[in-house]
Amino acid sequence: MKTAIILSLLSFLLHIHTNAQNTIKGRVTDKVTRQPLESATVTLQQRGDGNIINYTLTDADGRFQLSSSSLKDRTITVFYMGYRKKTIPVLISRPLTIELEQEAVLLKEVQIRPGRVWGRQDTLKYDLTRFTSSKDRNVSDVLKKLPGINVEENGTIKYNGKVISNLYVEGMDVSGGRYNQINNNLKADAVQAAEVIEGHQPIKSLRGKTFTDDVALNLKLKPEVRSQWIYTVMAGGGYGEKALYDASFNVLQLSRNRQTVYTYKANNIGRNLFSDQQKLASGNSFDRVTDSNPPIFLPLPEPAMPLSQKRLLFNETHTASANRLYRLDEEKQLRFQLGYIHDRTTRQYGSEEIYYFAQDTVHTATNRHDRLKTDCLNGEVNYEDNAASRYTRENFSFAGTWKSGVSDITGDNVIFQKIKNSQWELKNYFNQLYTKEKYTWGIRSYIRYTHLPALLTVIHRNLPVSSADNRLIATCIHRRDELNLPDNINENTYRTVTGQTYESIPTEYEEMNIDNAYTDNALYGMRKKNGVNYQLTGGFRGELSSVRQENSYSAPRYSFYTIPRIEWERTDFLLTAAATVWWNRLPKQSYSRFYAAPSLYFRYKFSPRWKMSLSGSLDESEGGIQDIYPFHYREDYRTVVKHTGKVAVTVRQLYTCYLEYKNTVKEFFWTLSASYSHNRYNLMAERNYKDGNFYLSSVERNHSSYSYALNTIGSKGVYDWNLKTSLELTLARNEGKQLNENIVQNYRYDYLRVEPKIVWAPSALFEVEYKATVSCGGSGIGEDTRLDPLWDVAQRLTLSLGFHDTDFRLSGEHFYNDLSKDQHLNTWLADVSLIHKSGKWRFTASAMNLFNKEQYRYTLYSAVQSYTSWVKLRPREFMVSVQYQIGRASCRER
């Protein structure tokens, strides 16, 4: 309450000192046709030095609006592709009409064709009508075809290897970063163009003042779609090992004044719906808060996914979401979001693991059957007032997650494990910023509270009993919730379920309840003069963690910090230097530390096509409560954790180099990045194995680790062939130390990954998509142990044939895996589908896993271990579905 009062008073005091701004309004049109020019770039500049004061893009009617504290010595400059640049002085504050003339380009005997990709300054535009085909189902399918853009399996969008910070539709973010709800539900042919905005600064009062490296993507809809409510219903059924279902219903309305997205989806065919509720975009960097993640002591098992999840996921999932965004006026927006997901998942897998310790090599083998249940409810309210002279953001969110995992584990012993793990969380973020001429100042506050109750139950069946007895015991425990039985199973409970008696079963319980509160509050200010931006931030961070086990334990910590920062920017280069000065205090550990964390960044543009950057930083951090918790606890059925209670300190040096080239005319994009990291630690993790358990602890011992990485991405589009190709190459090496039985071992892990992709549509009748991943990893442990490099190759080829309104699609996958130096495995998988479209109807028949492969095996290395695993695949399955979509004009738009 005190914090809220202080924030309100500061906001009020800041507000009363803000002077009125001069607003410049205008319209940009073609000089000959008088037609409005949409998305023209309009900049307000200082006469003489050319410094940008503010900038914006014109709307569909060619209109724009800019604000400035003064109109003295200001000019307006307008850029638009295919037109001459025009600069006019700003004399009085009145509506402007700016007419642009088309550029006449005379080229002898050269045929000029409009391109699919073009750009000016920091905005790159893709004409999606040149990329979309009748075989594309949604926007995500089209984005995969764009040169320079990559869409990962979970829907994450990257431009030149960088994750986008925001995805907009008509300049508005209705999903709040959960953009799969847009890309997976919006029709492919509904979008006119996609705009990539580099150096994206959504806060108007900071444009032209401070540097940002964010990249945003804006989707421009076709005019007839903006005024529509789009309803889509899909229902499908089929059969595999059991009856299958797949259903969805979504409603979209994406106008420029308000936007709505309602969705409901359900399936048990292996389609992961969690990504629809996942925030894939982090938002603008100025509003980004560094938060220490809530501590989780008893995590649920999360096995690796070596294949696409549709091959491995045995699920029953239902999800629903509602998103509503209102544009209150030109500067204010209000957004509501609510989502819920219910999921039941089963997994069957096993692993043979080898741990290479200093004095011994440990072999373990397990087979598991996991049953996971998840319920998650989340909501968010976001208000923004984004004007040229001020910026206000108030964001409140909540999330509740209830998880329960039951595992039947066989190997050397028969073990039953159950973990209940919940998380309830409240967050509030507030930012108030003001700008007056060259000065900017504001306040920022973030508060989070998290409650995490968790319970682990492990039942060991080490006694020589029959498999029938084991099945009865498992039945007893598995039906506990169904029969409303207590967690502590006794003989009477067992007799209730099975009608029999049994000996005392060795049972272990671990119950931990964690409360974690975190806050970060700061005052900041900046001044830009002669192209140099001087910034100063000062703030306070605090965290209180409380753990209730057999004993109660709390660990408060707090920090005071100040960040002086300088940005020196010219037309071709940018230099930033900062030094975060910290004073950290952990009173319970009697720990205090004062240190500085400097950083340096340099960027140079050789030309509009070439640019490079260099960076270096030194940082220091302390471990979380998991590292200083002084009591032992069982993390799972075979892992026991016990730390010393000492504060873990990590000092990190990071150096990066980045080179980029892009040629929009030739549709060619290329990046090269290299990094080197050196970490120094005061504590070393020790892992020992005894009596079927791994014991994890930490001891005071200084040591270091190193990592090197090289990554390059090339993407090329060919207009005449309707072709996109891309290639990504990654090389990495990690070096460090491990501790076992008080003996230190060095280790080194090397990794290579090559990922080519091809999308080719030579005609409307035929389309080919090819993707491959070639990877190789090898380890060296100690002086004598060398793990032979193993190759893994995954290839997928998809062929699509179209005949009028019918498409036939065949997809084949081949996996080559080295299981050892002398043993390898080939796996073939195939799917087929037939799609018929008739008006607003879409009919689909499909068959998955045609060869009915039951299992997939693979071998992987980590730094100090190797494991050969198997996982159960979804069987051969057949599905039919029907989809119907209609669009209805909005009453307000008509």
Identify the function of each model-found stretch:
Residues 24-30, 62, 98:
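A short, amphipathic beta-strand motif
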Residues 753-776, 784-890, 894:
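Conserved C-terminal beta-signal and adjacent last beta-strands/turns
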Residues 518-520, 551-555, 559-561, 648, ...:
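Outer membrane beta-barrel strand-and-loop segments of large Gram-negative receptors
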Residues 207-209, 273-279, 346-363, 404-413, ...:
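Outer-membrane beta-barrel translocator domains and adjoining extracellular loop/strand segments
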Residues 32-46:
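Short, ordered, surface-exposed loop/turn motifs in non-cytosolic proteins
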Residues 21, 61-63, 84-94, 115-406, ...:
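Membrane-proximal, glycine/serine-rich, low-complexity loop/turn segments characteristic
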Residues 48-63:
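Short, acidic Ser/Thr/Gly-rich low-complexity loop/linker segments typical of extracellular
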